[in-house]
Amino acid sequence: MQNRKTVAVFQLESPGMKDLIKRLQPTKFEEIVALLALFRPGPLDSGMHDEFVNRKNGKVPVTYPHKLLEPVLSETYGVILYQEQVMESARVLAGYSLGQADILRRAMGKKQVEEMDKQRTIFVNGCKDNNIKEDLANKIFNLIETFAGYGFNKSHSAAYALLSLQTAYLKTYYPEYFMAAVLSSAQGNTDKISSIIKECKDMGINVLSPNILTSGTNFFVNPKKQIEYGLTSLKGVAESFIYHLSDEREKNTFNNLLDFSKKVNVKLGGKKSLESLSKAGAFDSICDSRSIALACIPDMLKEGDKKASDALFAGDLFSNVEEDFNPYDQYKDVNPLNFSQKLKYEKEALGFYISGHPVEAIKDDIKDLRSHKISDLDANTSSATIVGLVNSTRQIKDSKNKPITFVNFDDESGSMDGIILSDLYEEKYGIIQEDTILKFYGSVEVDDYRSRETNSTMYRMRVKNINAVESDLVDSKKDLLTVSYTHLTLPTKA
């Protein structure tokens, strides 16, 4: 946890939380409880988190509003953090009963001004009866009033912290099983699945590509401690079809596409499901290439129609042909997909790339176009030319109401952010599109925010020029970068 490897850890995975963890360096459960109470708008806006961290780390002395409050506030280094501490402070200083203290708690939580004024009088009088001077009593109540804007229930924070600790424990000691469960819980959210798979890679966990022979409905860990892909996470695949497929596979394995067509009701999935499985590579284990799998889909569906319409069907789907005849053999000469097409199809079916990166497809052609890979950047790099795939863009306005564009791009080695000022953006906006490979040139500097987020040195670029990569490649290589997919010309069935 102190190393901020908290992706998928309950409540602890946001960049801001990671930054607070780095500063606080929690060493015990109570500090995790405090961490969760501090990371909320009220404490963050008031600067309470800074005070807490500085006291914990010995940069600021730990003091208490009154010596009677040391047992109440020692756990939080003299900072009033929880509603329960306010209740106990009122009891210790002003003689409140538990019932009266709860009235004070509710008045704070609901910000009841009249009730708080009434409580001030009760509190100050109680403190005076306890030999505490009126001025000090009012100062302490002022602290309590300030706390009313951001007070949190300790029991809630403790419950969250317990879940945080449990998930961190599971991630540490049962990483494969924990990450498989996290992936299964993220089904339907391709961005989340993509980020978790990247985290698995960083952890040394191998997430396998979809496989019709081994993948389950959900993600799971195989005997080799690899994570098998959950087929219900594929885009465009009918969930009922995946469950049917899984049931059929328990009875018999699939030897090839013909065998698959004979044993599975392909009509239940339809064309869209079969295309998604093919593009994701799920048929790779029973078919020579993904292009062949895609070419076979119309015939697979035709056989499904025959099977569904034959009310007297009771046996081999191809019982009227020779046993060694495979009607899909006619597609064996279909050209395989090139690397770029393969990756594009993966993104269609999965929502991300799993077997490589588009920049890899042109790495030989761009070796003279770029000065660095992203992973090559270091403290001595003042400027660089990077070829990267645009992942996302966002804009803010400067003081003159002109756009400043932030672009995130990556290559086969890593990712980084670029800052594009308005003049350059106006000139190049037409090519700055997601999923486009561009050549970025600019000055390089440390990205403090992302460095804190990742606990490693990250860089960003102040972009000075942008070009479309295809304009720098020979025409014969442009097909590798085309946005649309190449259509297959397939032989007709005899």
Please provide the spans of the model-predicted regions.
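Noncatalytic, beta-rich nucleic-acid-contacting surfaces in large DNA/RNA-processing enzymes
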Residues: 1-488
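A short, hydrophobic C-terminal helix/tail in secreted or cell-surface proteins
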Residues: 489-494
